[in-house]
Amino acid sequence: MKVTKYLPILAVCLMTTGCNSKKEAVLTSGIDLANLDTTAMPGTSFYQYACGGWIESHPLTDEYSRFGSFDMLHEKSREQLKELIAELAAKKDNAPGSAAQKVGDLYNIAMDSVKLNKEGAAPIKEEMAAIDALKDKEEIYTYIAESQKKGIRPYFTMFVSADDMNSSMNMVQTYQGGLGMGQRDYYLENDEQTKSIRDKYKEHLVKMFQLAGYDGATAQKAMVAVMNIETRLAKAARSQVELRDPHANYNKMDMETLKKNFPTFNWDAYFTTSGLNDLKEVNIGQPAAMKEVADVINTVPLEDQKFYLQWNLIDAAASFLSDDFVAQNFDFYSRTMSGKKEMQPRWKRAVSTVDGSLGEVVGQMYVEKYFPAAAKERMVGLVKNLQTSLGERIKALEWMSEPTKVKALEKLATFHVKIGYPDKWKDYSALEIKDDSYWANIERASQWDFNDMIAKAGKPVDKDEWLMTPQTVNAYYNPTTNEICFPAAILQAPFFDMNADDAMNYGAIGVVIGHEMTHGFDDQGRQYDKDGNLKDWWTEEDAKKFEERAQVMVNFFDSIEVAPGVHANGELTLGENIADHGGLQVSFAAFKKAMETAPLEVVDGFTPEQRFFLAYANVWAGHIRPEEILRLTKLDPHSLGKWRVDGALPHIQNWYEAFNITEHDPMFVAKDKRVSIW
């Protein structure tokens, strides 16, 4: 996936085939024939043909809204983390302040359901009272800053990341937010499914306020106040598609201009409390949203804003309180919005919390035990091959002029590649894990994250810093550092198998590598130059040709019906779809080049070329609930797994040739209608 400052994190829906008992098959081709549905035709639905057997043999369990082989790998990683963490948690002699003490104690606190249930709402009572004690609206600005330090984000989000126009320097930035349902469409759309979710959200608000100690009448009043404020914020917010435009979301201003543009917002109080006393400039990502924040604070009665601030506290803390809070939180966010039927066991939630709060501490332990050096060496070779392949494809493009090709090749040559784990680890010595409440420890961990972040404000960007931990089963491209990153956890079977042949590895991890590289040249990435600056390096004619070709992709995915009456969003998913398309093209070309010196044979009746596409399709094998389809279609810039196969392959000529797809097959797309970019 592409990482931007706005969406801190290939998508969590990345999937691949799970481990199997056919050791001989894995050692030869990496393709498990049991994954296939040979009653299906490759040209009718290649997804069903390649993944139907896997889908049938892996029914969706109640704790998931979607589950694929990616999730299998994630579960494997979590089991490995549990082994590391539980060993430390069992020790009684961990040195105070040591990494072992922090990891072990936080896990034990998370697992202590007796203590959590005895405490109930007590861990948030003091903060609830502090909100109640706010005397006037001026104190709201100080409270917003204090709460953001603790990981609570009312009204908007503030963060520090590279300046898009001066990517070597970090800058303070703001981003729209403050919505309990996360996305503006849930407040504004009036289809039956959205209205039902909105009604259930109102019920959820009332129940949570009651759990926090309010009587029914006051909880109802609080719900109305929260909905009024959040609806106002939603109306001023940009759509998911609008948030993809880097120029529209770049609005840097000095402090004088900031105060002039938002005169009613007390920036001095906010930034001073945040620890940013000498701030010179800031990027207001979405000015209309920030203007509405200022108007809400200025015009909404203080009592209503107190309810809203308390809701943000309750919502942030709910997962770390007693079981009644956790259950109600699950009921709305997981059951209603995603279709999950059962909560994950406590140990899984505890491991995830430790992983999220002490990421690189756990990551260092993970790498030492589970990441072989040979995997990194093999990946370095694959990345070089893919980089060469993309360069050759750029040189051969008929639609692009030489001046733009030169710039594109310069950018490709300067890719910063990160594999496995960072060369230097974060220092968590200032973070204290104490024997008090679970929520108090989460707040301290959030405070540590906040301090780590604001220390970068106005400082040079550290290009050696990682935006994912090594134990994350994922990958990313970051445009402002022009880097591609492949954490250790994704570099294992079945994404990447040292014992499988090139057909499998190029079809799986090879396409992932090509996908991330292509992000540097998708509709967003192409707007950043080799140094990571938001700077136009295209000729006007080439930019127009790119946009025309990209529109073919938009139109094709817009036509896909993902559920009855619901279509994919071709604009929202454009960047990821271009990256899938480019990843397939680039990796297949590199694969064919590799076979010139190391030819492969037919295995299990499949040619090497066929196994390449089977490996790719198996990456996306999985189940997904109807509720999750609808949720992801609203907000996810990635296409659904099925359509990353059946939507991507009809535009790949080599796939047609590998499986003899003709105009008589339903997936066939005429050559003049196919996408052709990278």
Feature names for model-found ranges:
Residues V12, E63-I85, T218-A236, N505-V511, ...:
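Short secondary-structure subsegments characteristic of cysteine-rich extracellular domains
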Residues E24, T38-T44, Y49-V114:
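Active-site-surrounding "flap" and adjacent substrate/cofactor-binding loops of secreted or lumenal enzymes
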Residues N20-K22:
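Bacterial signal peptide processing site
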Residues L88-G381, N385:
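Noncatalytic, helix-rich "gating/capping" subdomain that lines the substrate-entry/channel surface
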Residues N35-E56, Y187, D191-Q210, L574, ...:
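Hydrophobic/aromatic-rich, well-ordered segments within soluble, folded domains that form packed cores
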Residues M15-G18:
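C-terminal motif of bacterial Sec signal peptides marking the signal peptidase cleavage site
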